[in-house]
Structure formats: C-alpha cells, structure tokens
Amino acid sequence: MNRSELVAALADRAEVTRKDADAVLAAFAEVVGDIVSKGDEKVTIPGFLTFERTHRAARTARNPQTGEPIQIPAGYSVKVSAGSKLKEAAKGK
C-alpha cells in the first residue's frame, strides 16, 4: 500500500475528505519526526507502534566492491517496534 492508497483508506474509514486525511497523515509524520529527532523521548501508540531514536556506535565494515575495511562513524538511527495488537493482527488472530 502506498501513501495515496493509505490516505484513501483513512479517508473512507474516518469519513473525511482525502485532503483532510492527507493533512493528518502529514502532520503525524512531522510530529513523530520532530520528537524522534530530539531523541529525549519515545513516541508510543499503545498496542500499535513505538518509535525511538537509538545510538549506533562507530564500527569497521568492508567495502563490498573492494573488500577494503572502512570506518563508519557513530550516529543515530530510528527503531520502530510493533505493539501487541499489531503483532496479533499480523498473525491473523
């Protein structure tokens, strides 16, 4: 499902216009991005998803073309965890 299909499904389910559903989805993504980028708190939707920023340590990897070792600097990544209700839905229960 792509963004436009998701917006259409949200609009139908919530009985709002596609424009309004798209605005809500865009605002949700922006708010989650802002909170996660600060890194001081998680965004949790109980039973559904949790978004949090994680620290990745510096590490040595290999260039896949040459096999030469390269240094990858420390940085941050985003961890998304499925909640219990989403896991149950994926199992078909």
From Swiss-Prot:
<dbReference type="InterPro" id="IPR000119">
    <property type="entry name" value="Hist_DNA-bd"/>
</dbReference>
<dbReference type="GO" id="GO:0003677">
    <property type="term" value="F:DNA binding"/>
</dbReference>
<comment type="similarity">
    <text>Belongs to the bacterial histone-like protein family.</text>
</comment>
<dbReference type="InterPro" id="IPR010992">
    <property type="entry name" value="IHF-like_DNA-bd_dom_sf"/>
</dbReference>
<dbReference type="InterPro" id="IPR020816">
    <property type="entry name" value="Histone-like_DNA-bd_CS"/>
</dbReference>
<dbReference type="GO" id="GO:0030261">
    <property type="term" value="P:chromosome condensation"/>
</dbReference>
<keyword id="KW-0963">Cytoplasm</keyword>
<dbReference type="Pfam" id="PF00216">
    <property type="entry name" value="Bac_DNA_binding"/>
</dbReference>
<keyword id="KW-0238">DNA-binding</keyword>
<dbReference type="GO" id="GO:0005829">
    <property type="term" value="C:cytosol"/>
</dbReference>
<dbReference type="GO" id="GO:0030527">
    <property type="term" value="F:structural constituent of chromatin"/>
</dbReference>
<comment type="subunit">
    <text>Homodimer.</text>
</comment>
<keyword id="KW-0226">DNA condensation</keyword>
<dbReference type="GO" id="GO:0009295">
    <property type="term" value="C:nucleoid"/>
</dbReference>
<protein>
    <recommendedName>
        <fullName>DNA-binding protein HU 1</fullName>
    </recommendedName>
</protein>
<comment type="function">
    <text>Histone-like DNA-binding protein which is capable of wrapping DNA to stabilize it, and thus to prevent its denaturation under extreme environmental conditions.</text>
</comment>
